[in-house]
Amino acid sequence: MLRYAITDRARFKGDEIARRSALLAQAARLAAAGIDFLQLRENDLSTADLASLARKLLATLRAHTPAPRLLINSRADVALATCADGVHLTSAPGQLTPGQIRTLYAAASLPEPVISLSCHTLDEVARAASSAQDERPTHILFGPVFEKVVAESHPSQKSIANKKIATGAGLDMLRAACLAAEPIPVLALGGITRGNAASTLAAGAAGIAAIRLFLSEPTHILPQSSH
């Protein structure tokens, strides 16, 4: 089972310095626990600050063997500048394609990048899977499977700790996404817990992606991964 953690320093207490320090400490715990991937998703940071944090995370992760792979959310420029292991692409317009990112990595004499892609519908999954080989992502993050924090109220939402939680796509949709994505591995995202992770694997997922799960239980990250 692949395990893919996503950062969110806003969940830590203290000032900016304290939060970045806590994030690095979390990364060290995750690496020691055997996480496979860590996505740096701190899009409010300036380019310089994001690159600085990426370099510190890379040093932290690469102190472990095997070292988890670090992916930078959306910012291929930062990934290249820091020699990160890859890039995570969202559905936002204007981003580079997987093929373009691979070309840039090759031009910089860097190893083949890991490229993950967010998909929220079966159509998005099908488009990714039917792309030319060089344009396919390494992994697809499909979700939200169980739930997602949203800003607006909706009949399918409940309030938890003053936040709105929307019902996810469910396991049947995840199963369909895994079939549509073949041969691209799919990681389940959205409301993943220790209690429901096994059900996503039974539905065909190759692993799980999460923020809260790995923040709350960094040293108990479910079954052993397959590096």
Predicted regions and their residues:
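Acidic/glycine-enriched connector segments
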Residues: 100, 105, 126-129, 146
